[in-house]
Amino acid sequence: MEANPNIEVDLMHIPSEDFLTKLNAMIAAGEAPDVSYSASWKCQMGEDGLIYNFYDLLDDMGLSKDDYLSTCWWNWSPTESAGPVQANVTTNLMYNVDCFEEAGVDLPPTKVEDAWSWDEFVEMAQKLTLDTEGRNAADPDFDANNIKQYGVMFGTDWNVYMPFILSAGGGYLNESMDGLGLNDEKSAQILQNFADLINVYHVSPTAVQKNAMPSAATALAAKQTAMYIDGSWNHLDLMNSGCNWGVGVLPIDENYTTFFDGGSLIIFKSTKHLEASEKLYLWLTNPESSERITELYRTLWMPVQTEYYTDPDKIDFWASEELPARPEGFQDAIVKATYDHAVVATEINVKNFNEINTLVSSALEQVWSGKKTAEEAMTEVKSQTDSLVEGTYSGERS
């Protein structure tokens, strides 16, 4: 690091599928890294006393809790934290502008107050879904077995459906937070709405079809889909795809609720280089620390510091719509919509989230395939998940 030339950083890359296994092996061998990226399992490491309580390090680093967005802390108790999200992402609607113009339909709204209802969204997806003869999904002669362009594709993990569930008054957990809540009426209906895009309206590909299709950016650029709902991390690939793309608010027209999310950097108590680890942390999480870090915050990531959402100059620094990964409407649809309507992300808040969500994701495959209704599948999986449910870290439903 040019800012700290006396600090030498040894990097280690671990594939995501092996990450936790490898990290646990290093810890068991007394060879834990000084600093590590981490997912929701970090809070258990905090409870086990393996990592520093970030609140205890704030003064040393010249930081304050108020420097960061209030919904972005990975806390394992009210006074103990693994730290704030390193770099934010959020769920968003991305689209191919040309598909909309060719279909003669209005572009997705970028302001929350103008957001489509779910029914309006489905109608738009029908108009944008085309068979090989050019008929859209609203046409009575539409051939659902020969589709060349889908109206929408979506990620099937929690980050996609939870904004809709939270906005509808549902939750990942039930109201008493002692069991899964995805089988509750409001939550199950949202999951069913997504499944119906595939199996009823035929505006989204089946799981088998989707597996044979490329990434979000490539699918949008190739006009295999007109819209895609998933994480903002896709913006870097969209920037490089050559696609004429845009972003809009999610199709939620009442009680718009969403979240920032992301992993974080943790510092292990076993480190012999605490001061150097703190400096590395500050360098990696400062959007203005270097050209490379700045580039990441202007394409792949979003900041976690509050000033980058409240100071107009700071907003423009990373979210100016003159930047290639920040299309027209980005500041309204992504920055403002998320900042104004964010709650704590489900994976940050729910205890034992990794273990629970592995079971939920497997059960949802039956929903996406149309073999079971959302209510059926989520009611069945409760028998496996509820022994893992221990509430939330905040004490509030998520």
Language model features: what each stretch is:
Residues 37-42, 213, 230-235:
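Beta->alpha turn/N-cap motifs
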Residues 91-95, 100, 165, 265-267:
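Short glycine- and hydrophobic/aromatic-rich loop-to-beta-strand nucleating segment
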Residues 38-92, 101, 119, 138-146, ...:
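Hinge/lid segment of periplasmic solute-binding proteins
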Residues 234-242, 254-260, 266-358, 396-397:
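C-terminal lobe and pocket-closing loops
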Residues 99-108, 131, 200, 270-277:
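Short helix-loop capping/hinge motifs at secondary-structure junctions, enriched
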Residues 2-68, 83, 98-104, 108, ...:
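Extracytoplasmic "Venus flytrap"/periplasmic binding protein-like
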Residues 122-126, 176-209, 239-241, 250:
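Glycine-centered hinge/linker elements that transmit conformational signals in sensory
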Residues 13-22, 113-120, 206-221:
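Short helix-initiation/N-cap motifs at beta->coil->alpha
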